[in-house]
Amino acid sequence: DADLAAVYRAVASLADETVRTMAIPLLSTGTFAGGKDRVLQSLNHLFTALDTTDVDVTIYCRDKSWEKKIQEAIDMRTATELLDDDTTVMKELTRVHPDSCLVGRSGFSTVDGRLHSYLEGTRFHQTAVDVAERPTLWPRREEANEQITHYVLGESMEAIRTKCPVDDTDSSAPPCTVPCLCRYAMTPERVHRLRAAQVKQFTVCSSFPLPKYKIPGVQRVACSAVMLFNHDVPALVSPRKYREPSISSESSSSGLSVFDLDIGSDSEYEPMEPVQPEPLIDLAVVEETAPVRLERVAPVAAPRRARATPFTLEQRVVAPVPAPRTMPVRPPRRKKAATRTPERISFGDLDAECMAIINDDLTFGDFGAGEFERLTSAXLDRAGAYIFSSDTGPGHLQQRSVRQTRLADCVAEDVHEERVFAPKCDKEKERLLLLQMQMAPTEANKSRYQSRKVENMKAEVIDRLLGGAKLFVTPTTDCRYVTHKHPKPMYSTSVAFYLSSAKTAVAACNEFLSRNYPTVTSYQITDEYDAYLDMVDGSESCLDRAAFCPSKLRSFPKKHSYHRAEIRSAVPSPFQNTLQNVLAAATKRNCNVTQMRELPTLDSAVFNVECFKKYACNNDYWDEFAQKPIRLTTENITSYVTRLKGPKAAALFAKTYDLKPLQEVPMDRFVVDMKRDVKVTPGTKHTEERPKVQVIQAAEPLATAYLCGIHRELVRRLNAVLLPNVHTLFDMSAEDFDAIISEHFRPGDAVLETDIASFDKSQDDSLAYTGLMLLEDLGVDQPLLELIEASFGEITSTHLPTGTRFKFGAMMKSGMFLTLFVNTMLNMTIASRVLEERLTNSKCAAFIGDDNIVHGVKSDKLLAERCAAWMNMEVKIIDAVMCERPPYFCGGFIVFDQVTGTCCRVADPLKRLFKLGKPLPAEDKQDEDRRRALADEAQRWNRVGIQADLEAAMNSRYEVEGIRNVITALTTLSRNYHNFRHLRGPVIDLYGGPK
């Protein structure tokens, strides 16, 4: 709306003394209106803008109904209202909103009067003065409006003034009394009433512009009654002065003269007295200062240099344009002669060739079959309808949900592969963007350069990988899959409560911890002596060798600075990469568990696969998978690299320099690497014993780079072959998961959870064979399967101090590219073996990695023993009950929403609280992202329908009380960045040499 008004104002600015006529179509209508009727909206902006000029305007339109609307609007504006002699016009009239309590009182009107007033003499005067002060403190309208919302929610004027970054401000101007005509108009009166009612949440419409980010307590709706006028008061335009009629000499040229223009009044009425123009208020009754006449269709004069002198718009006519696309344009008919002989102006003479061109058929180009209907019927009403993209990366707003439908029931749909646009290498553009960034080092230029640089890297990596895998790259035949989409989940309203101070919020969290975990809050880490002094940079510690550079040995550790954590959960900072820690990790965490089983290895594996297919799968696809194997293709390597984010693409670019071909990559080589982060579990364990070092057995980087391309196809095939009630969480958002589970979990329903101890280590030979057989059945091509098989199975190694050679059994290596996928398949296989028909008949079962839940199943005495005897797995079984002991899955609780009657998953607030007590490196810059993530979770915790369930969940799992106070505190801390910074204490410097 604002852009449309600005365009018309720009057109009006082109008028000067030499431009007396304009021919203009209505902008943003027809095909360009986005499926909406914008005729009157566009027309009103045209009136408002061109009222400041002195031109005669011809409006072109092709639609008869539009012509009628436009003519009626012009007639309404040019109509003259006759007033009685004894009528008194009230000059001090203030226009107010139709819903105002001031309607009908002396000095106030709903159709006429001033639009800006302090509302003196009313109880809303002080509020109007306060509202008017905002634009002087914050010139940007969005920022000023945001402060008004804070004022409504109870913030004092003094507090708002202290937030202003400057000391000196101008005097205020009266606020607008009618910003729009809908029920949510933010008039001074409504602001006063909302503030007096001490509301915690209120609604504003789109006529009250706010910043893009979410403001707590403020809901936004589209304005249902926009005021279609420009808030800026038009400049004063003196009335047009008409010259005395005189006979002008005819053109002496021998050519044809076309389109003569009449200047002068054709009206029989005398002009009225000039009236100073007022801001356009009501389109129904407007006094015109000039006589009315109709004129002929006039051509548009050639563009001339614009001048700034404004004129008043006085005459308009609607001239219909022929509707067909190819039709001879006839010269317009002459109108009846005027009462006075007009002055004739000739626009120049045209030769015969130009006349022939003018009289020819005009052809605008025809639409293809169905093209026009498709353009006009395109529904562009949802978020993401308009996709903006940079010159490199993919379009924004195109991340669509893959598991949800807008229908009310579950539907089956074909799976369509998402189209990926391969990156193109353009070194010249990268060089130019680098120069541009060096000359003007702004954030925007830096971002453009980095985008192009990453794009070039990706293009080069794709070429390298395709070259290295050329023996394996073959064309493939696609399978047709069906997926099930679920209705979009419903959530109850989120009502947030905030504490007045962030310091109070931190104190509330610490008080909760001290009451429930007294040993945690009393625990102190002695910073100065917490690390060994054998710091080594650049060490490499593998299972059978260790290497470091002697020149990098130091007598004291590097300097280490971090913010002290204000929340006293005593979580240690990340492990330092010292030789001591790395070797401790390598020696303590590298052995698999003992294998004990009854069936022979291969028999057990075959039985596993048969149970998986019988109890967890349909039988629609296995034959097709065998006929259409999964191979490495150009498309899936391209797709994998294209989706990589910048840092990972740069790392892969470095690793693929001078790369080996795929057939020479050692698939069985794994390097032990240490996870630096400490695993956080709510409780006191981390204070009672030294935190365990987690280890990644990192596969050869090139093995991952070459073979990751087949992962998406494997996921698609697995999801297609599973029963409709069995789900994996691959490629799924939290909202997608809520959509899947929302209808199935009801209060009192039994839910089976299993917690498998040391899942990766416990996988023996039979489970390794099971994984390989399932990969083969899903259609992985034989050459690729041989490569993958080398990374399963046993590894031979050497004990460094003694030189003893030993073998690892077939444990799962956490750094292999298929670890999560195979773990999920084996998890479902274990459930199929021990539950059998109970899994098939369950309403809903979900699996990811070693985590699972199965609805409607209660455990029996044999369940854990079967897992141990048949599958070599030590399993802890939890019988959860909805609403009494809510189930725990993927780091969150599945709770029932009492308002919507559906269930959803919410994150574990206690785990979140413990994580906030982790020390943060001093140079960290990610706090705003952390705050935003915490704010999203806080919004979910504050849903009104899940409060009772969340309390029950925390009580049953952790036996803690008062989690509501913690949620209020976390909501307060996540409210803004200023609050969130209260989690970070002063910077502490460790080491760095003798003191």
Swiss-Prot record:
For nsP4 adenylyltransferase activity; Mn(2+) supports catalysis at 60% of the levels observed with Mg(2+). For nsP4 RNA-directed RNA polymerase activity. Polyprotein P1234: Inactive precursor of the viral replicase, which is activated by cleavages carried out by the viral protease nsP2. The record marks 385-386 as: Cleavage. InterPro entries: DNA/RNA_pol_sf (IPR043502), Macro_dom-like (IPR043472), nsP3_ZBD (IPR048891), RNA-dep_RNA_pol_alsuvir (IPR001788), RNA-dir_pol_PSvirus (IPR007094), SAM-dependent_MTases_sf (IPR029063), Togaviridae_RdRp (IPR047311). Zn(2+) binds at residues 180, 182, 205, 223. One of its GO terms (biological process) is DNA-templated transcription. ADP-D-ribose binds at residues 30, 32. Residues 749-864 form the RdRp catalytic domain. Its EC number is 3.1.3.84, 2.7.7.19, 2.7.7.48. Keywords: Host cytoplasmic vesicle, Host membrane, Hydrolase, Membrane, Metal-binding, Nucleotide-binding, Nucleotidyltransferase, RNA-binding, RNA-directed RNA polymerase, Transferase, Ubl conjugation, Viral RNA replication, Zinc. A motif (FGDF) lies at residues 347-350, 364-367. PROSITE patterns: RDRP_SSRNA_POS. GO terms for molecular function: hydrolase activity; metal ion binding; nucleotide binding; poly(A) RNA polymerase activity; RNA binding; RNA-directed RNA polymerase activity. Polyprotein P1234: Specific enzymatic cleavages in vivo yield mature proteins. The processing of the polyprotein is temporally regulated. In early stages (1.7 hpi), P1234 is first cleaved in trans through its nsP2 protease activity, releasing P123' and nsP4, which associate to form the early replication complex. At the same time, P1234 is also cut at the nsP1/nsP2 site early in infection but with lower efficiency. Viral replication produces dsRNA in the late phase of infection, resulting in a strong activation of host EIF2AK2/PKR, leading to almost complete phosphorylation of EIF2A. This inactivates completely cellular translation initiation, resulting shutoff of host proteins synthesis. However, phosphorylation of EIF2A is probably not the only mechanism responsible for the host translation shutoff. The viral translation can still occur normally because it relies on a hairpin structure in the coding region of sgRNA and is EIF2A-, EIF2D-, EIF4G- EIF4A-independent. The genome codes for P123, but readthrough of a terminator codon UGA occurs between the codons for Ala-378 and Leu-380 giving rise to P1234. P1234 is cleaved quickly by nsP2 into P123' and nsP4. Further processing of p123' gives nsP1, nsP2 and nsP3' which is 6 amino acids longer than nsP3 since the cleavage site is after the readthrough. This unusual molecular mechanism ensures that few nsP4 are produced compared to other non-structural proteins. Mutant viruses with no alternative termination site grow significantly slower than wild-type virus. GO terms for cellular component: host cell cytoplasmic vesicle membrane; membrane. It catalyses: RNA(n) + a ribonucleoside 5'-triphosphate = RNA(n+1) + diphosphate; RNA(n) + ATP = RNA(n)-3'-adenine ribonucleotide + diphosphate; 4-O-(ADP-D-ribosyl)-L-aspartyl-[protein] + H2O = L-aspartyl-[protein] + ADP-D-ribose + H(+); 5-O-(ADP-D-ribosyl)-L-glutamyl-[protein] + H2O = L-glutamyl-[protein] + ADP-D-ribose + H(+). This is Polyprotein nsP1234. It comes from Middelburg virus. Its cofactor is Mg(2+); Mn(2+).
